[in-house]
Regions:
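Repeated loop/turn-to-beta-strand initiation elements of outer-membrane beta-barrel proteins
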Residues: 48-50, 79-85, 111-118, 158-168, ...
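Cleavable N-terminal export/targeting peptides
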Residues: 1-48, 80, 113-114, 160-164, ...
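Gram-negative (and chloroplast) outer-membrane scaffold detector with strong preference
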Residues: 77-135, 237-307, 316
Length: 350
């Protein structure tokens, strides 16, 4: 079973292929436009860091290790302080299929040069764990908070040339939730360093991409259970996205999750986003959080129900005003019907 996809319980190889393909296109398109990275110590903006890493995840001794992965966005605010948002997959262990999102503060403890950094980080980890349960489905979607501690080392082999924005990463992550399993993860990955559009001296470039965007999307829903591959459906969505201030955006949309046999759900999503853009709006990466007001035809309780939604997105603009967008939504419910929605979308910016 392939364990490295863009989110967790969807068919994993296909998720990895799509996200890797889009990242490769972004890297190739952005190479000529990148300037040398700056430093907050000189007054120049520090580059943002985006990385994808695979991890070997260890838990109880009687369980063999499994493969996990993560996606991270890090922003440097001062020479010795940075903050990151990340999605972490904590692999599959007996009775536990866990992943989650985290926000960490980072302190570089060996800032030897711009080419090599060693940092220690920590912050809250909100996890989603599919666990065994004595109910009709045989499982429950358990949610909870924990602390995450991390150690991270990066090296940037090239300081000039077409690959100067790439870096390689090694990291260790540790978390021990009070109501879930303890895990220690050892990972390696590849990343991209680039200056966000908001720091460009050209006022028009600093705006990033257009203030408004309409996106029509289509792909699939996967209901989170121990037999997720049997509970999938086609999904479609339409969204309106609006820039609020610099890298902050807001979206409202309609989502139809289809019929997975466990859910038959559709409704309205509203989310706030942190979405920096790069290379004059050529591409962007973002994380969102909000609410999903939906009707589930298979839920006994009548009427609309409000769930949380956590999202990631990556967009690429191949031609003027049009963009291709990859979206992942995690629907977080209180009735054991969490779901992953993966969407490919075509957007129009104006």
């Amino acid at each position: 079973m392939c364990n490295a996809a863009f989110p967790r319980r969807t068919p994993r190889c296909s998720g990895l292929q799509t996200s890797t393909l889009l990242l490769a296109i972004v890297a190739a398109a952005a190479r000529p436009a990148l300037a040398d990275t700056g430093s907050t110590s000189t007054g120049d903006p520090a580059p943002d860091e985006i990385s994808y890493f695979g991890e070997r995840v260890y838990s109880l001794r009687q369980w063999p290790p499994d493969s996990g992965y993560g996606i991270s966005y890090r922003k440097t605010f001062a020479p010795y302080f940075a903050a990151s948002l990340a999605y972490l997959n904590d692999a599959h262990f007996p009775g536990h299929h866990r992943d989650g999102v985290t926000a960490e503060a980072w302190l570089p403890i060996v800032p030897l040069s711009n080419r090599f950094t060693l940092s220690v980080g920590g912050g809250p980890f909100y996890y989603y764990d599919t666990v065994f349960a004595r109910n009709n489905g045989g499982y429950a979607d358990a949610h909870g908070w924990a602390w995450l501690a991390s150690l991270d080392a990066t090296i940037q082999p090239w300081k000039s040339g077409p690959w100067r924005h790439l870096f390689f990463e090694g990291r260790i992550d540790y978390t021990s939730p009070s109501k879930s399993i303890e895990t220690t993860s050892f990972g390696i990955g590849i990343g991209y360093r680039g200056i966000s559009d908001i720091y460009d001296k050209d006022v028009e470039v600093a705006k990033g991409f257009a203030e408004n965007e309409i996106v029509a999307s289509y792909w699939k829903t996967v209901t989170n259970s121990f037999n997720s591959s049997s509970h999938t459906a086609r999904a479609e969505a339409i969204d309106y996205r609006r820039q609020i201030w610099k890298e902050l955006r807001f979206s409202v949309g309609f989502l139809n999750e289809g019929d997975t046999q466990l859910i038959r759900r559709n409704g309205i999503t509203t989310e706030g986003w942190l979405e920096p853009s790069f290379n004059s709006g050529l591409w962007s990466i973002g994380a969102g959080f909000g609410f999903y007001t939906a009707i589930d035809k298979y839920r006994p309780a009548p009427g609309r129900h409000v769930s949380d939604v956590v999202s990631l997105t990556l967009s690429l603009r191949p031609i003027r005003n049009f963009d291709v967008r990859l979206l992942w939504h995690r629907i977080v419910t209180d009735y054991n019907r969490d779901a992953d929605i993966l969407l490919w979308g075509l957007g129009y910016r104006f």
